[in-house]
């Protein structure tokens, strides 16, 4: 049996997440450390207003902290992953779980990343469900203002680009459902190149250890442990596509049998059910999930 720990990204947050973890010493210590770095309380933010929690500059640090705590609690119970991966923001949690950087370094990176993404303006993102694949591929070929931002599953993708470009694709591609996303910019596209420049410099200057277990990155989901290579992939992430469908397929091909979503919600296990039905799925999002292991 080989287990992959996968960490969700923005969109998995929910009011009340992570509060039950406070009964553990590991969580208390991490929440205190996070407050010193962020200047605000993750626990209070997670117990507050839904609209405030949904702001990129709040969501991303909160998710990273909670996912890091859950990974620590799993290890404290004697569990170890054979592989790790994370969806967009979740890649930072995966790198922490693989020992590429420590908790504080990861949170400082996530804080800056969230501020860069929150301040991005212009552009649009939209999710398409049960869409005509041939139509979409042709539309993306014809429309240079839009890219495939998240290839989540055979039935779900996210596109990103100019407002006019995204709206044109939504109007011309048949889909069971198409939902514009409530985000400030065209994330995971070349439109993030300018705002992400300073953050890329921060990442370049940051030391990355070699990973203790193979990491499957968003922009290139081949198993990698070399710290410098993992850094290169992370630098490309904000402007590159999240190749999540390939990540799930690759996990199965390299021998993963169990797929644990470490973080709030069930977004990633939901995607995996449709793409790789043979994998054993488990959600580790709260204390009850840990206690049931």
Curated annotation (Swiss-Prot):
Gene3D superfamilies: Malonyl-CoA ACP transacylase, ACP-binding, Malonyl-Coenzyme A Acyl Carrier Protein, domain 2. Keywords: Acyltransferase, Fatty acid biosynthesis, Fatty acid metabolism, Lipid biosynthesis, Lipid metabolism, Transferase. NCBIfam families: fabD (TIGR00128). It comes from Synechocystis sp. (strain ATCC 27184 / PCC 6803 / Kazusa). Pathway: Lipid metabolism; fatty acid biosynthesis. It catalyses: holo-[ACP] + malonyl-CoA = malonyl-[ACP] + CoA. Its EC number is 2.3.1.39. This is Malonyl CoA-acyl carrier protein transacylase. GO terms for cellular component: cytosol. GO terms for molecular function: [acyl-carrier-protein] S-malonyltransferase activity. The keyword Cell membrane does not apply. The active site is at residues 88, 188. It is an enzyme of class 2 (transferase). GO terms for biological process: fatty acid biosynthetic process.
């Amino acid at each position: 049996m080989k287990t992959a720990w996968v960490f969700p990204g923005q969109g998995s947050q929910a009011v009340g997440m992570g509060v039950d973890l406070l009964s553990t010493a590991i969580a208390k210590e991490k929440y205190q450390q996070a407050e010193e770095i962020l200047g605000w309380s993750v626990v209070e933010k997670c117990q507050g207003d839904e609209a405030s929690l949904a702001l990129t500059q709040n969501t991303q640090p909160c998710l990273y902290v909670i996912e890091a705590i859950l990974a620590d609690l799993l290890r404290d119970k004697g569990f170890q992953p054979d592989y790790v991966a994370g969806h967009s923001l979740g890649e930072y949690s995966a790198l922490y779980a693989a020992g590429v950087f420590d908790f504080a370094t990861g949170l400082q990176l996530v804080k800056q990343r969230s501020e860069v993404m929150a301040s991005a303006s212009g552009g649009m993102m939209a999710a398409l469900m049960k869409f005509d694949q041939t139509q979409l591929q042709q539309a993306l070929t014809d429309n240079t203002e839009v890219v495939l931002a998240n290839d989540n599953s055979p039935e779900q993708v996210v596109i990103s680009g100019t407002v006019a470009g995204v709206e044109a694709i939504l109007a011309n591609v048949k889909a069971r459902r198409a939902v514009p996303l409530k985000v400030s910019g065209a994330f995971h596209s070349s439109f993030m190149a300018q705002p992400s420049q300073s953050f890329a410099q921060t990442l370049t200057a940051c030391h990355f250890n070699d990973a203790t277990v193979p990491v499957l990155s968003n922009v290139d989901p081949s198993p990698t442990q070399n710290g410098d290579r993992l850094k290169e992939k992370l630098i490309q992430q904000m402007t590159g596509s999240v190749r999540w469908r390939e990540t799930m397929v690759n996990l199965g091909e390299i021998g993963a049998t169990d797929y644990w979503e470490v973080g709030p919600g069930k977004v990633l296990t939901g995607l995996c059910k449709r793409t790789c039905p043979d994998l054993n799925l488990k959600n580790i999002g709260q204390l009850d999930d840990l206690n049931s292991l």
